[in-house]
């Protein structure tokens, strides 16, 4: 388990590596010895002493330059074990061979660690030569995952021939790994809470910038009058096809001919022809199937009652289960009425409102108009037809006594009484019959008398002689 101090200040490790010079091998030779002062951050006991570290002038005299060093000036490593309850326990410390430690100077190098200290890290305050007390701090942390079976500087793996700076390098490397993991864990925790953590470039402190900002939509439609913006180039490319009406994917089904902008829409459309509905609602008692996953997702909101699409217009507050419904609703607030009635010219904001208007008014009006035409349609010789043609009624044959001539037989007194009668020509009780088949288009009446038949045009009939001369009255012998 990493300590709270490590999680809050993991940047100390990075600063130490950047600002501290550590030899990489025994071939490194420095002409002068440098004082490395120990700045104590831990409680100092009476038995604690510090000694000066002398970097040797020549790497070949390591075996001959060893001097006796007090036992309190040795470098110790901390062995940490994780107990069964998840808490860290301090194990025994292992003493390192003081091969390169010198007692010729009184400057302190390292500080003894208290065996009773229960923290899980070691603070070794090392400074570069000339920096003094302004040196950066180093936090040495041993990775928990490597504690078991691979303790750093354990008594079994300790070798007096290994230089101390290699061990410090290894310890610093492990500490950097642990600190990086701690920082990543902290970033993941803050990201889950909706916060974005940035590391400052100047002071190295982490700062919370608040909620995550929305993704910037950089792709804007260049078509005049269109202000749509997009994040993904694929969506932007699809939108441009709508302006060009580029429907390059055509349905191959016979008699369909529908076209689409993208291939995926065509594939979904083909399911309407083959009847495929691969997406099923698994709610109890439902079992409805859909052609697309989006339709199934919208359908499930019926069961859950979820309406995630909220109208942001002031004072509205309506919410919808589908985004398409929200877009249709927004037209109401914009005042646009793009849907027009083809009969009366009235405009509507929604196509559904226009369709309701058509069914309510114009369909009833059309039915009423046809019914009125049927009711006002008079018989073939009706007076309204004659008045419309501006023909005097006294010169024509009138049949007002019969509502219809469709297939009915009319009894006439005699054949000579058809013409020249002012009011009514057709009278009941005649032994002779007239079979009339009305022709609404030509307004003709066929009359029979014995073996002879006559066709009379009622619009031009004046007298029998004129009818014969003009061809309005014809005689057929059968």
UniProtKB/Swiss-Prot annotation:
Zn(2+) 3 binds at residues 281, 286, 299, 303. GO terms for molecular function: DNA-binding transcription factor activity; RNA polymerase II cis-regulatory region sequence-specific DNA binding; sequence-specific double-stranded DNA binding; transcription coregulator activity; zinc ion binding. Induction: During fibroblast senescence. Zn(2+) 5 binds at residues 341, 344, 357, 361. PROSITE patterns: ZINC_FINGER_C2H2_1 (PS00028), ZINC_FINGER_C2H2_2 (PS50157). Residues 187-213 are annotated as: Disordered. Zn(2+) 2 binds at residues 251, 256, 269, 273. SMART domains: ZnF_C2H2 (SM00355). It comes from the Eukaryota. A zinc finger (C2H2-type) spans 219-243, 249-273, 279-303, 309-333, 339-362. GO terms for biological process: negative regulation of gene expression; positive regulation of transcription by RNA polymerase II; regulation of transcription by RNA polymerase II. Zn(2+) 4 binds at residues 311, 316, 329, 333. It is found in: Nucleus; Chromosome. Zn(2+) 1 binds at residues 221, 226, 239, 243. Widely expressed. The five zinc finger domains are necessary and sufficient to bind to DNA. This is Zinc finger protein 410. It comes from Homo sapiens (Human).
